[in-house]
UniProtKB/Swiss-Prot annotation:
Compartment list: Cell inner membrane
Function: F(1)F(0) ATP synthase produces ATP from ADP in the presence of a proton or sodium gradient. F-type ATPases consist of two structural domains, F(1) containing the extramembraneous catalytic core and F(0) containing the membrane proton channel, linked together by a central stalk and a peripheral stalk. During catalysis, ATP synthesis in the catalytic domain of F(1) is coupled via a rotary mechanism of the central stalk subunits to proton translocation.
Protein name, UniProt field: ATP synthase subunit b 1
Species whose genome carries this gene: Cereibacter sphaeroides (strain ATCC 17029 / ATH 2.4.9) (Rhodobacter sphaeroides)
Residue stretches spanning the membrane: 4-24
An annotated Gene Ontology molecular function: proton-transporting ATP synthase activity, rotational mechanism
Family classification: Belongs to the ATPase B chain family.
Entries under PANTHER family matching the protein: ATP SYNTHASE SUBUNIT B, ATP SYNTHASE SUBUNIT B', CHLOROPLASTIC
GO cellular component: plasma membrane; proton-transporting ATP synthase complex
Amino acid sequence: MKKLSILAVLAASPAMAATGPFLSLSNTNFIVTLAFLIFMGILLYAKVPGRVLGMLDKRSVQIRTELEEARALREEARTILASYDRKQKEVQEQAARIVASARDEAQAAAEQAKADLRASIARRLAAAEDQIASAEAGAVRAIREQAVSVAVAAAADLLSRQMTPAAASASIDESIKEVEARFH
């Protein structure tokens, strides 16, 4: 603080350039210099520079504390950010696994559906082939029955033309005897 006072006195040296006697109360430069020195003396007596320095020291301690808190908060924020980044990576990996699993399950379900469809088509094809075979057998049977019916009708017509009433009576008697012989 003493250095500051000396500096203030030296800064007042241009007051020496004023005209007339310097130590006169009519010289404004002298009055200003004197007032400044008295003001500085009062400040020194009241220990204002010490108080100002104390306040500045307190403020610097407070600023230092706030800076340390800010550093701690920044480190905590970095830690939290790193944690969130790890969690985000884990979530992305889990989502990728879920998508891959769903894709695999969908592919397996599609394969199963294809296999079921093939089996269903094979069953329907077999059933259709069975129906076709049954229809063929029915058609063959109907044709045979029709052929037998036509043959019997033709034979009956042929026999009726060739048979006389006496020959028909003899044939009926012979058939009755043959049936009796087989049942006894």
